[in-house]
Regions:
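N-terminal subdomain of nucleotide-sugar transferases
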Residues: 1-50, 200-204
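Active-site proximal beta-strand in glycosyltransferases
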Residues: 2-9, 100-117, 145, 158-161
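A conserved mid-protein helix/loop that constitutes part of the nucleotide-sugar donor-binding site
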Residues: 25, 181, 188-204, 220
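Membrane-proximal helix-turn-helix segments that form the acceptor-binding/catalytic region
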Residues: 29-32, 102, 125-144
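A structural motif in glycosyltransferase catalytic domains
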Residues: 34, 183, 198-201, 210
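A short, active-site helix/loop in glycosyltransferases that binds the activated sugar's phosphate group
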Residues: 46, 131-173
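An aromatic- and histidine-rich active-site surface loop
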Residues: 84-104, 109-116, 151-154
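Glycosyltransferase donor-sugar binding loop
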Residues: 186, 209-222, 229-235
Length: 240
């Protein structure tokens, strides 16, 4: 019998025809992959906006506010033989980690990116201070894992190597004589993702072009460069 694994996320999840959808591909692939070894229960924030990727799990719950979310965290903590995984540090997941600690449970926190840089991009100078406060406390009461050593900032933790590149991406390799560099970015167009910095770096570079896949319907990207092509989200990866 599989052990239960509760995954807590700050990501928004929409519901349509009893199916659950998210924008962040990691929130789809990580729980689905772990579900092969655990009985995964995914918890997240409810979104009224339709999201892109269907999460193929049987046990998903979404919440309108932090109070109902924490109430379910309390219920989950009663499963004594279960594991608890928190994806990324945000105000929501920060409170969840503290709440689990008060309930006598020690979660695993998975850090996928540098929160210091992301919060600086979002909040300015105060951003790194705000993230440092959450990171310091969370790191002291949790077991950390990350995809990069520098993200841990010297704290003890495990390093893993996740990748979305599977056999579909690698099925037809070619040897090319590269004269012009063609870059591909697949993801959300957000300042904290660094995409605007990349656009500025290649501005006026005639030998470099960038294709961005991830534009949201009805929302301006704010990027207008001749060497950048912006396309809407593509669900089927074989179409890339």
């Amino acid at each position: 019998m599989k052990k239960k694994l509760f995954i807590f996320s700050n990501e928004s999840i929409s519901i349509e025809d009893n199916k659950y959808y998210c924008d962040n591909l990691d929130l789809k692939s990580t729980p689905e992959g772990l579900n092969k070894k655990f009985e995964v229960n995914l918890l997240g924030r409810k979104s009224l906006k339709k999201r892109s990727h269907e999460i193929k799990l049987k046990r998903i719950k979404v919440f309108n506010n932090i109070f109902s979310y924490l109430s379910e965290v309390k219920n989950a903590s009663k499963n004594l033989d279960s594991k608890f995984l928190i994806i990324s540090i945000s105000p929501y997941t920060f409170l969840i980690s503290i709440f689990l600690k008060t309930l006598g449970r020690k979660p695993i926190v998975y850090l996928r990116s540098d929160g210091y840089g992301e919060y600086k991009a979002i909040l300015g100078k105060i951003g790194p201070l705000f993230y440092h406060f959450m990171f310091s406390i969370t790191g002291a009461i949790s077991n950390l894992i990350s995809c990069r050593d520098y993200i841990l900032r010297g704290k003890k933790g495990k390093i893993i190597g996740p990748s979305q590149l599977d056999s579909v991406w690698l099925r037809q390799p070619k040897n090319l004589d590269i004269k012009n560099f063609k870059l591909l970015y697949v993801g959300r167009i957000r300042v904290e993702k660094g995409i605007f910095s990349l656009a500025e770096l290649i501005k006026n570079k005639r030998d470099i072009s960038l294709t961005i896949i991830g534009a949201e319907k009805g929302r301006s990207s704010g990027i207008n460069q001749s060497n950048i092509k912006i396309l809407p989200r593509i669900i089927n990866k074989t179409k890339f």
